[in-house]
Curated annotation (Swiss-Prot):
Chief place of localization: membrane
Subcellular location: Cell inner membrane
Role summary: F(1)F(0) ATP synthase produces ATP from ADP in the presence of a proton or sodium gradient. F-type ATPases consist of two structural domains, F(1) containing the extramembraneous catalytic core and F(0) containing the membrane proton channel, linked together by a central stalk and a peripheral stalk. During catalysis, ATP synthesis in the catalytic domain of F(1) is coupled via a rotary mechanism of the central stalk subunits to proton translocation.
Protein name: ATP synthase subunit b
Keywords on record: ATP synthesis, Cell inner membrane, Cell membrane, CF(0), Hydrogen ion transport, Ion transport, Membrane, Transmembrane, Transmembrane helix, Transport
Similarity section: Belongs to the ATPase B chain family.
Bilayer-spanning residue ranges: 14-34
Organism: Chlorobaculum tepidum (strain ATCC 49652 / DSM 12025 / NBRC 103806 / TLS)
Amino acid sequence: MLTSGIILLEGGLLNPNPGLIFWTALTFLIVLVILRKTAWGPILSMLEERAKSIQSAIDRAHTAKDEAEAILKKNRDLLAKADAEADKIIREAKEVADKLRADLTEKAHDESRKIIASAKEEIEQEKRRALDVLRNEVADMAVKGAEKIIRTTLDADKQKAVVNDMIKEMAASRN
């Protein structure tokens, strides 16, 4: 510390030497020229390459982002289209099912009407046959009754007996 104080007292540091300034500046300029010739070019080219690399990475990132957005939009469009197509298919299937149900219902109603009409026709035919048979039987019985009446002279008791006999015969012939 003592030596520092002596140098300060002598004015060595506060009075710069012009020769020392010249040689220091000259050395600095020489080092600067040497560095410019040897190191400055590679440093700048390395910085430029690094800047190009960073810009290229940024460009690739933007391109990838744009492609991803395009793919996302395409996928959304495809999904919307698929949803619309699915809705259309479901709607068409419901329409076909409703039409098929209506057709089957109409066919079933037609078939039941035919069966009912056929059954009514059969019933009507059976009714006519039964009435024909009944008329024939009644006519036969009336003829037989008339024959009996004609053969004998009837009083009131005999008439009742003949009618009762005819009723019994009709009941027996039906069974």
